[in-house]
Amino acid sequence: MNRMKKAVSLAAALVLMLGCACAFAAGNGRIRYEGEGFATPEDALACYMEGLKNLDFEQMMSAFAWETQMEHYDLRVFLERIGAYQVTMRPRMPSINDFMFSANVNVLRFYQADLIYRSIEAYILGDDDPAKAATGSVTFESNSDDVGAFLEKFENGRLEKLTQMTNIRFLSPDEITDNKFSVGPNPEAFIRQTACYGADEAVNLVGVADVGDETLYCYPTICRYGDRWYLVSVSSFTSMIIGVSNLNQAFVCGPGSLADLIR
């Protein structure tokens, strides 16, 4: 009986090893995360916004260039523009081999996903967001139901309200920056900021939609590689001009004007 168990275990291990080997051989050791890209920047942004409406995180992530971005990314240009190397930067190490390329792709995905995650949290919690507390955190009393009461705040219906999103439309950066995007040193600054992406073309586009009695805004950087468009970042030169906080980099949604929402 023991011999049979050992034989079965060995066979299972061999099947698993062969399966893994075949999977890596087929993809040259890489998993490819990005989709086929989009014909226009509007199509790319619509995919992102519709993913939010559908409460489909993977659909939102499918709007981005992951591998293509890292294949063209110029870290030297980025560091020369910033003038510093900081451990908060993502990505921050060169893709000198397949291992580092894969590491950078995954770090990039984590970073953008975390920005979306943070904006969703801020949207759901509103004034109860820990970032709005003086301490920057929420503390719980022992021997109380503070934790339960806090967790219930995530079931307030805000997330589900996003499924009411309608009338997706697009604005130029100038339409929400009082034309600041296209005047003075800003056009050249935009070119410098986006040069690190190594894209054939980079644009900022503002997505707007109605969510019940509220308005949603997002303002990503979108790039063209060849004839395909992708998001490369949820943040942008536009969001920098209007002063979007770290809470709302991926999107902001609420009543009132954009200026009111990001204040």
Regions inferred by a protein language model and the residue ranges of each:
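Sec-dependent N-terminal signal peptides of Gram-positive bacterial secreted proteins and lipoproteins
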Residues: 6-25
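Residue-level detector of alpha-helical recognition elements and their boundaries
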Residues: 63, 75-76, 237, 244
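Short, low-complexity N-terminal intrinsically disordered segments enriched in polar/charged residues
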Residues: 22-62, 66-73, 80-110
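Low-complexity, serine/threonine/proline-enriched polar segments
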Residues: 86-183
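N-terminal secretory signal peptides that target proteins for export/translocation
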Residues: 1-3
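Low-complexity, intrinsically disordered terminal/linker segments enriched in charged
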Residues: 154-156, 160-263
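Short, aromatic- and cysteine-enriched interfacial helices/patches
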Residues: 26, 124, 261-262
